[in-house]
Design a protein with these regions (language model features):
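Eukaryotic beta-rich interaction modules
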Residues: 103-110
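Long protein-protein interaction modules used by eukaryotic assembly/scaffold proteins
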Residues: 2-96, 100-102, 115-260
Length: 260
């Protein structure tokens, strides 16, 4: 079961016999050679898979980093002057220039990279909370599916808790070009940007937290701790676009509190 985490601040007597022995030896050598080739082939396939998984994980990791920055900018959690423009995905993206926020996001991304490469992440959540009331007013959820994970590892625990369920997929993904993946990511960011048209304005000062749903057997640094799901009470939910790479699929969902 995946758990939400957040930062805290393995010798023959005859010629006939000799001939038979030689034949057997040649056969064994053949088998050994065949087995060796088979092992080598499997090893090569494993290396290719690991490289593909690493590359796919990097794509998802970068997407998360820019998602956090985009949400903070678009939702006005910090002043616009605290952000700077950069080019990414063929778009102009806004990233924080505030040293404290940059350090916080960097710490999150450093650990997230390790968990992503290990295939331990099932969900990343950005929660916006009112400083005055402590109420969670907006929740951005990114569900991560790892293709083929379900067929390789089965969860030892079953759960009926939708929030903690592990999204898995045994589908074989279509091969996509880098341009196709980028186009899908562009669509997600355009939707996040356009969400200001239907999301209520955030009243007063707000802060944010990042929750990472990692497998229960994940190594957790001391500065990270268990967290509740920080759900929006009686909130509205809107499903946004998704994107997929060679090994991952990421779905986006935003929940928000309706104005009084």
């Amino acid at each position: 079961m995946a758990e939400p985490r957040t930062t805290r601040t393995s010798k023959s007597s005859s010629s006939t016999s000799k001939s038979a022995s030689a034949s057997k030896s040649a056969s064994a050598a053949k088998a050994s050679s065949s087995k060796s080739k088979s092992k080598s082939s499997k090893s090569d396939e494993s290396k290719v898979h690991k490289l593909a998984l690493k590359g796919s994980s990097k794509i998802v990791n970068e997407f998360f980093e820019y998602s956090i920055n985009t949400i903070l900018f678009q939702r006005g959690v910090y002043p616009a002057e605290d952000f700077t423009a950069v080019k990414k995905y063929g778009l102009t993206m806004m990233v924080t220039a505030d040293d404290q926020v940059k350090a916080y996001i960097k710490k999150i991304m450093s650990q997230l990279k390790e968990w992503m490469y290990g295939g331990k992440i099932t969900k990343l959540v950005v929660v916006i909370t009112s400083k005055e009331t402590g109420e969670h007013v907006e929740r951005w959820q990114f569900d991560v599916q790892i293709f083929g994970k379900n067929s390789k590892t089965k969860s030892s625990k079953a759960t009926t808790d939708q929030e903690n369920s592990v999204p898995e997929s045994s589908e074989v993904p279509e091969e996509k070009t880098e341009a196709e993946i980028q186009a899908e990511i562009q669509s997600v960011f355009r939707q996040i940007t356009a969400s200001v048209t239907f999301l209520p304005m955030l009243d007063g000062n707000c802060t944010f937290n990042v929750l990472v749903y990692a497998d229960a057997d994940s190594d957790v640094p001391l500065e990270w701790g268990d967290s509740d799901a920080k759900e929006i009470k009686n909130g509205e939910k809107v499903q946004l676009r998704s994107f997929s790479s060679s090994n991952h699929r990421v779905d986006t969902l935003v929940s928000y509190r309706l104005g009084d």
